[in-house]
Amino acid sequence: MRLSREIVDHVAMLARLGLTEEERELMREQLSSILEHVSRIQELDTEAIPPTAQVITLQNVWREDDVRPSLPVEAVLANAPESEDGFFRVHAVLEQS
């Protein structure tokens, strides 16, 4: 499956990536290759294989909750397309009822 330039441009826009023409073509080739691989995997007969949600038997391995310095809010929001009152502003995904 060869991706169109429009799809690559759309994915780049969603990821907020500014791509050069060379990067766009490389991304097109790589994403097309990944989708072809996934397509081959989907063709496999897995009926006799039980679903596996967890392959490692470890559970609840926690680390200490240490407070560490973080970036100032202003520095983080400087990279956001939109912000408001110290928060990221995003477009609504769900309609209000």
UniProtKB/Swiss-Prot annotation:
Transmembrane segments: none annotated. It holds the Pfam family GatC. GO terms for biological process: glutaminyl-tRNAGln biosynthesis via transamidation; regulation of translational fidelity; translation. The keyword Ligase applies. Keywords: ATP-binding, Ligase, Nucleotide-binding, Protein biosynthesis. One of its GO terms (molecular function) is ATP binding. It catalyses: L-glutamyl-tRNA(Gln) + L-glutamine + ATP + H2O = L-glutaminyl-tRNA(Gln) + L-glutamate + ADP + phosphate + H(+); L-aspartyl-tRNA(Asn) + L-glutamine + ATP + H2O = L-asparaginyl-tRNA(Asn) + L-glutamate + ADP + phosphate + 2 H(+). Its EC number is 6.3.5.-. It comes from the Bacteria. It is an enzyme of class 6 (ligase). InterPro entries: Asp/Glu-ADT_sf_sub_c, GatC. Heterotrimer of A, B and C subunits. Allows the formation of correctly charged Asn-tRNA(Asn) or Gln-tRNA(Gln) through the transamidation of misacylated Asp-tRNA(Asn) or Glu-tRNA(Gln) in organisms which lack either or both of asparaginyl-tRNA or glutaminyl-tRNA synthetases. The reaction takes place in the presence of glutamine and ATP through an activated phospho-Asp-tRNA(Asn) or phospho-Glu-tRNA(Gln). Belongs to the GatC family. HAMAP family: GatC (MF_00122). This is Aspartyl/glutamyl-tRNA(Asn/Gln) amidotransferase subunit C.
